[in-house]
């Protein structure tokens, strides 16, 4: 994510996955901030209050990203009016292609086909024609079966419609790039806040992980001194199962300052 933020700062556009990752961070930031408020209530001030308060969920930005991006594979039709219109035209053109091909498959070309299906080859709608009847179905050959007995032909009747579909696909991709560029610009305006959120969330994650481990180990925070004294109460080796480890008390630096530990040799 830090790499994505650096790219935003130099004016680059982010991909769908990168924008979703930033959106996810901000949504988690919002959840953490809401959790801190619900957990604290009217309790006494906490040492983490400042970190929680510094979090900025940037809700308008996350809302806009979620409105435009449905998943890592799909941009919403509602991302822009242009995209909605382009996709509507693609559907209309696709329906016209299927209507004409269905008429061929179930009508005049039926006896020349290997199978009554409509397929895609090289991004073009085609029908499977028996090789020996190639001349009976005027069109462009885009592929053939492994045995050579079937040719996948794009009938001349739909060449223009297939071209229209291809042009619409290019328009769709161009519009998606515009949408991602716009979202990237909006995100770039908040890079300082996003980076601050990221740093705080990482710190909180470490703090809570340490606290969870401490609770699991029944550990306490040590108090250090510069007098050369060590006093451990009910200490256990942290890497040994706490159910098997025998706690011991250790005192050094008061009555004696030398400790010899003996162990059985197996």
Where are these regions (language model features)?
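Amphipathic alpha-helices that form helix-helix packing interfaces
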Residues: 1-4, 8, 22-25, 29-32, ...
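Amphipathic alpha-helical interaction segments
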Residues: 3, 21-24, 196-199, 203
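Alpha-helical coupling/stalk and coiled-coil linker elements that connect catalytic or binding modules
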Residues: 8-16, 30, 42-46, 62-264
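Hydrophobic, well-structured mid-protein blocks that either form specific transmembrane helices
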Residues: 39
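Conserved, well-structured core domains of diverse proteins
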Residues: 46, 50-54
């Amino acid at each position: 994510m830090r790499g994505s933020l650096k790219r935003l700062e130099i004016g680059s556009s982010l991909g769908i996955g990168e924008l979703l990752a930033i959106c996810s961070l901000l949504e988690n930031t919002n959840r953490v901030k809401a959790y801190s408020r619900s957990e604290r209530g009217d309790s006494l001030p906490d040492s983490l209050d400042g970190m929680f308060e510094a979090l900025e969920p940037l809700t308008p930005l996350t809302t806009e990203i979620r409105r435009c991006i449905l998943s890592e594979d799909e941009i919403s039709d509602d991302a822009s009016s242009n995209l909605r219109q382009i996709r509507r035209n693609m559907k209309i053109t696709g329906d016209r292609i299927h209507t004409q091909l269905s008429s061929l498959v179930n009508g005049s070309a039926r006896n020349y086909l290997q199978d009554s299906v409509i397929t895609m080859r090289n991004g073009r709608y085609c029908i499977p024609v028996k090789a020996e009847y190639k001349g009976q179905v005027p069109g462009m050959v885009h592929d053939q079966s492994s045995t050579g007995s079937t040719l996948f032909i794009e009938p001349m009747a739909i060449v223009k419609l297939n071209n229209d579909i291809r042009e619409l696909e290019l328009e769709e991709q161009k519009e998606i790039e515009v949408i991602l560029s716009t979202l990237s610009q909006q995100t770039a305006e908040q890079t300082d806040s996003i980076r601050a959120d990221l740093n705080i969330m990482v710190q909180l994650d470490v703090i809570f992980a340490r606290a969870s481990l401490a609770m699991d180990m029944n550990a306490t925070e040590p108090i250090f001194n510069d007098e050369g004294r060590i006093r451990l109460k009910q200490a256990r080796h942290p890497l040994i199962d706490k159910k098997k480890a025998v706690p011991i008390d250790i005192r050094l630096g008061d009555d004696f300052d030398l400790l010899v530990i003996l162990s059985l040799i197996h």
